[in-house]
């Protein structure tokens, strides 16, 4: 008996080798990265703070170091000028222009030797050395002569004034000769000197290595007879008084600061358009000179005996 034939489903046709594969589904676009903090304003602020800190540190370096060199240069020039005038008997014995050399001060006890005293007690005058208060007589003349000196910056000639003791000698040479004084009293801003001797010398400086708020006073009596006084002494101004700031330096400070800003801006522009190293080398001397002028005028705004 023969088995019945079974019907088979038709076979699938063979896939063509040239059939195109089905396209893959498109992937979704990646989400945008989260926006980070804006660095522009922060970077500008950081640079501004860094620049301000650098300027302040530079100013401190000027006051505590470079100003000493400036005062030493003025002293050298003034000493040569005064020596010639003393030799030719043309040294001033009366009122003279501010900043002019008029005496040589020696205080052996604090190792202060051959220091030139200039006329005037403004902040700018005392950048040159100890200053003579112009409304008082010159040392060696009848009356009270007053000398101011700095305690911290610009050579700090009176930094050790507080070390003087009763009996220490002070010598002052002017156009009228050399005069000897003997320390006999002290004082400060709250306790002025009350010595009644007719012919005296008073030395004045600040009371602190930081910004002074009061004064140190040393009084000395003239040994021997005084020489005749010169012409009538001129009156003082507000900037001549102890602890005064030279507010006249403020306009100059603003102008020099503007010039410094323009010079730095010009250097930055030149560095972008030119060779950077060459641009900075050309600008460096100009910027340094302007920065020195800025610091000098800023120092004049501090108390004059600082």
Mark where each language-model region is.
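Acidic/Ser-Thr/Pro-Gly-rich, low-complexity N-terminal segments
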Residues: 1-33
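Cytosolic-side transmembrane helix boundary signature
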Residues: 28-45, 266-271
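Alpha-helical transmembrane segments forming the membrane-embedded cores
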Residues: 259, 263-306
